[in-house]
Amino acid sequence: FNPKAVSRISLDPAVVDCIVFWTKNPAPMLPRLRELERYKYYFQFTLNPYGADVENRLPDLSRRIETFKRLSDAIGRDRVIWRYDPILRDHTAKCMLGFIDHYRHIRGALGELGVGPLRRDEIEVMAQSFVRALEPYPIALETCTVKVDLRHLGIPSGMCIDRGLVERIAGYPIAAKKDKNQRQVCNSIESIDVGTYETCLNGCAYCYALKGNYNRAE
């Protein structure tokens, strides 16, 4: 998101190919999914097993897992991408794996948790554990903006705004190139980001989009 490049975005279904929602808790949206029936869309649902010391304002993990399943049952497993438990094996077709970026403004919070930069060998060990965990299940594993090449482990570099998935959901080809405004390791196609910093209430220690200003977000 670039706060210096703000514009008015039309949400007319005639000009919207697809909407991708990033969320850790879409529960409030479930009763209103019918309002989205005019649009083609899918979800990037981040679901981690961390405790309240890391993700301190989220609902209990068991509740979020149930939300994931309900969302998948409502719109289909191909349209709910799990961002980092075989427990979800029947409810998603893909898991996106990412590793923490040590942005300057979150180093203090990460330091308090004893979290430092990851070495290449540590990344590979964790990636291998995901490969083993998902091997028995029909869940594709891809990375998101990971600088370490993990293809030798069978993990390709994926994309959050996925041309193939958007085209399958929309039902027609998409005329979009790789987004040149993202990091070089990002493979996503061009899109328009609707949102802004300092608005999320989840309070995750590793979040780069909120600099601890919860009052502003509230």
Regions found by a protein language model. Give the residues of each.
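Short, well-ordered coil/turn segments that N-cap beta-strands
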Residues: 14-17, 39-41, 76-80, 92-93, ...
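Well-ordered, non-membrane alpha-helical segments in soluble/globular domains
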Residues: 58-68, 94, 119-131
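Flexible glycine/acidic-rich beta-alpha junction loops that bind and position SAM and/or redox cofactors
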Residues: 55, 88-90, 95-118, 145-158
